[in-house]
Curated annotation (Swiss-Prot):
InterPro entries tied to this protein: dUTPase, dUTPase-like, dUTPase-like_sf, dUTPase_trimeric
Reactions that this protein is recorded to catalyse: dUTP + H2O = dUMP + diphosphate + H(+)
Name of the protein described by the UniProt record: Deoxyuridine 5'-triphosphate nucleotidohydrolase
Entry superkingdom: Bacteria
Keywords in alphabetical order: Hydrolase, Magnesium, Metal-binding, Nucleotide metabolism
Function in brief: This enzyme is involved in nucleotide metabolism: it produces dUMP, the immediate precursor of thymidine nucleotides and it decreases the intracellular concentration of dUTP so that uracil cannot be incorporated into DNA.
EC number: 3.6.1.23
Length: 149
């Protein structure tokens, strides 16, 4: 199994290193590496530092920053860009675009779990211009064409 070297930018993170919660966990929790609590007003989007830098270094892998379901469902706190994609050659600190889509201000405390990091395989593709496609059962149907009528 490929391991990814995560570099720590902030010494406070020693006590809060990301870890898989269970053997079946896909994501690692990312924390708000801030000096003080941050109030995010309804409709506001802020960039929150995580204190972690990542360099995957292998183009067969990428990382995705995903929301934590409880924050979105209970408090309206989601990712401002919905999903953060981290390319294998990126070497900077991970920042979380955090959007309060709720109706109440939300206080984000230092080291609070904010998002999840998932490492995923990547397949780069080559394009081939063709005259037509081989027929498939679905064809060009989209936008619910295989569900309710």
């Amino acid at each position: 199994m490929k391991s990814v070297d995560l570099k720590i930018l902030d010494a406070r993170m020693r006590e809060y290193l990301p870890a898989y919660a269970t053997p079946g966990s896909a994501g690692l929790d990312l924390r708000a590496c801030t000096e003080a609590s941050l109030v995010i007003e309804p409709g506001q989007t802020v960039l929150v530092p995580t204190g972690l830098a990542i360099h995957i270094g292998d183009p067969r892998y990428a990382a995705m920053i995903l929301p934590r379901s409880g924050l979105g469902h209970k408090h309206g706190i989601v990712l401002g860009n919905l999903v953060g994609l981290i390319d294998s050659d990126y070497q900077g600190q991970l920042m979380v675009s955090t959007w309060n889509r709720g109706t109440q201000p939300f206080t984000l405390d230092p080291m609070e779990r904010l998002a999840q990091l998932v490492i995923v395989p990547v397949q780069q593709v080559a394009f081939n211009v063709v005259e037509d496609f081989d027929a498939s059962e679905r064809g060009a149907g989209g936008f619910g064409s295989t569900g309710r009528g």
